[in-house]
Every structure is written in structure tokens, then in C-alpha cells.
Amino acid sequence: MKGLVILVSLMCLALYNRICAYQVRGMRSDVLCGDIRFTVQCICNELGYFPTERLDKPCPWPNREKRSAPEDELAFEDYEDQDYFHPRALSIPSEIEHDNEKESDAFSILSRGKREIAFYQECCNIRTEHKCNRTTVSLYCRTY
């Protein structure tokens, strides 16, 4: 009986594999679930929100080309040592960290974790959902 309980527990843990994925409207293929930061960079490039972003590898969906700025348009010397530099850091603004958030943001901040807040700050307003490994995650995209 103990063996059966342990076996069922292990099966439940194996099946409960929550991996986040982010998807936007118009993309017909899956995104790379394991590398969220790089996937978000690809999404922002795909949408044209960060057209000057330089990507070090192709985006994780077929038939897509990476976008890059001409070498003389922007200087990235300070960031060449950092992998997959993003023009805006995926972080929580200091007002939110110190509980000085705007009243309109209060509900959304209370209902999201830190990682979700970071993505909410980067890409907002167009809500889409994508299923990846039995987990549904929303992505919000905003034009600047």
C-alpha cells in the first residue's frame, strides 16, 4: 500500500510540470519554454517594440528572422559582455518595490508575482494566452 501511495505521488509530481511560455497574437508556432528572457526579447523584436535589439541567436520559432540594428546606429560596447542584452531591464520599478505604486496598478500588482510584474511592465495591454506543457500563461504587449 505504501508503494502504491509513493508511486501515485511520483506520477502526480511528474505530471505537474509547470513551465511558463509566452505567446503573442499572430505567432503560429510555440515559443521556447525554457529560456523565458530570450523568448521575451524575440517577442518584443517580432512586434517591433524594440527594433534596435541585437539577438545573438535565432528566435525559437521557425521561419522567423532576427532583427538587428545597423552597427553604426547604436553603440553597444557597454553591453557586449552581457548575454542577450535587453534595452529595458526586466525588473520591477522602484516605486512598486517600495509600495508607492499608482492606484490604477494596485490590483494588478497584488494579483501577480515578481516575474509576472516584470513582464507586465515590459509588454502590456494586448492579452493573449499560450499553452505550453499544460500551463497557460498570459502575455501583455504594449506599444511605446
UniProtKB/Swiss-Prot annotation:
GO terms for biological process: cell differentiation; sex differentiation; spermatogenesis. Disulfide bonds join 33-123, 42-59, 44-141, 124-132. The keyword Secreted applies. Residues 68-113 form a propeptide. Coiled coil: none annotated. Residues 1-21 form the signal peptide. It is found in: Secreted. It comes from the Eukaryota. GO terms for molecular function: hormone activity. Androgenic gland. One of its GO terms (cellular component) is extracellular region. Glycans are attached at residue 133. The keyword tRNA-binding does not apply. Keywords: Cleavage on pair of basic residues, Developmental protein, Differentiation, Disulfide bond, Glycoprotein, Hormone, Secreted, Sexual differentiation, Signal, Spermatogenesis. InterPro entries: AGH (IPR020382). Controls sex differentiation and the formation of male appendages, spermatogenesis, pigmentation, and male specific behavior. This is Androgenic gland hormone.
